[in-house]
Amino acid sequence: MGVFLDMRTSMNSGTVGQPGLSLGPSPEAFGSIGLQTLGVPNPIITLNGTVGVTGEVGDTFVVELVRGSVYDPFYVIYRAEGTVGQNGGAEFHSFTAQDLSAPPALESVYTSFISGVSTSVRTGPEVFHGIAASN
């Protein structure tokens, strides 16, 4: 049976219409959390979140989750590509990932990033959650 260690939430935007920023080719952070993992070996980290995107039909975007606070492709633990399916309306895209190979640390930091074509806009909400447990 698993043992609960910590749970954190990062809410960049809780409403539709914000932050209203265009996507670009470089990943931009929309959430960051630090989970207290207490130096436990092999913690089980479960991450999830939602991002709202508006754009032209067929516009693509990428959500990446990184172990750490700075974007580095080496530390990407999750990558998902999405496509805008309707014109003009806000679409909500949710994701769930696990980091089953997190190193023992007092705190494990995770950051969520988004990138995409410039005709797409981050319309919110933008939330990022994490739970740490041990077995």
Label each region the model flagged.
Residues 1-44, 56, 129-135:
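Terminal (often C-terminal
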Residues 50-107, 113-135:
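Terminal beta-strand-rich extracellular "head" domains
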Residues 47:
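Aromatic- and Gly/Pro-rich donor/ligand-binding loops
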